[in-house]
Amino acid sequence: MKVVFMGSSEFSLPAFEALVSADSYDVVAVYTKAPKPAGRGYALTKTPVHICAEGKGIPVRSPVSLRAEGEESIMAEYAPDVIVVVSYGLMLPKWTLTASRMGCVNIHPSLLPRWRGAAPMQHAILSGDTVTGVTIMQINEFMDAGDIYLQEVTEIGEKENILDLSRRLSVMGSRMLLKVLDSIGSIQPIKQDESGVTIANKLEEFRIDFEEAADVICRRIRALYPKMYFMLDGSRVRVLEAESYEFAEMNIGDVINNELHIRCGGNTALVPLVVQQESKKPCDIKSFLCRFRGKSMPVVS
């Protein structure tokens, strides 16, 4: 079976590698996002999928847009039996849906129709979902609304962050993808239940709002790891791990038994466990607080 693979992020890699390793599939081309400046030197950096595909000698295309002139003709030359799309990052024009014999098959890291959109895993953690999963679906012209070939469920660990969950679901999805492709001609996909739709828009606010309840902040820290931060004496401090509890009385920024207890909304407190101050390495909270020994604790904001 001739496959065109579309993917860009680390999440895409297990599926790509599974397809390349399987004897039944011939990955004839890879589509991935164009290299972009990254790092301190702003050097042009290729996506993980781009690097992996080049190492395997597979042709790579990285158009800025699939709507550009000539893209449809180029795809036709590859004559794929199926197009597999996993965390690609570009909008698919309508012509891609009919560019292969079996259409476009997608790995989506949620139990559709719950959490359609760009950040399904983040929203699952943030909302306190205890289970999530992976959906293998047929792409149609609407966002994450295609018919479902296969779903599998998994629990979300109590302390699992987005990186851990993403790694697990990417491996889970790669196994499910092969299972679907091996029998795609005999599987009858199921339509999604539109009454159960929830939307997972991209989350882009990373400063901790201490007006929120501390348990919500803890979920946000896990969902957006390692980006959530507070300000301390003009410096950003990322919170990488934290706990929460309810309290009777305390002051904002109390230090109790070498722990920082931060008052939050709803009579709750946040206790950072692992933090990273700007330009410094991550450390446990006791090591962090040693920097202020003999000094008054700056205001947390």
From Swiss-Prot:
Keyword annotations of the record: Protein biosynthesis, Transferase
Q: Which reaction does it catalyse?
A: L-methionyl-tRNA(fMet) + (6R)-10-formyltetrahydrofolate = N-formyl-L-methionyl-tRNA(fMet) + (6S)-5,6,7,8-tetrahydrofolate + H(+)
- GO MF entries: methionyl-tRNA formyltransferase activity
Please give the Pfam families that the UniProt record associates with this protein: Formyl_trans_C (PF02911), Formyl_trans_N (PF00551)
- The residues listed in the UniProt record as binding (6S)-5,6,7,8-tetrahydrofolate, with positions renumbered to this chain, are S110, L111, L112, P113
InterPro entries, per this entry?
Fmt, Formyl_trans_C, Formyl_transf_N, Formyl_transf_N_sf, Formyl_transferase-like_C_sf, Met-tRNA-FMT_C, Met-tRNA-FMT_N
Q: What class of enzyme is it?
A: transferase
Which E.C. number(s) belong to this protein?
2.1.2.9
Tell whether Transit peptide is among the UniProt keywords: no
Domain of life of the source: Bacteria
What's this protein's family per the entry?
Answer: Belongs to the Fmt family.
What HAMAP family does the entry give? Answer: Formyl_trans
Name the job this protein performs: Attaches a formyl group to the free amino group of methionyl-tRNA(fMet). The formyl group appears to play a dual role in the initiator identity of N-formylmethionyl-tRNA by promoting its recognition by IF2 and preventing the misappropriation of this tRNA by the elongation apparatus.
Report the protein name in the record: Methionyl-tRNA formyltransferase
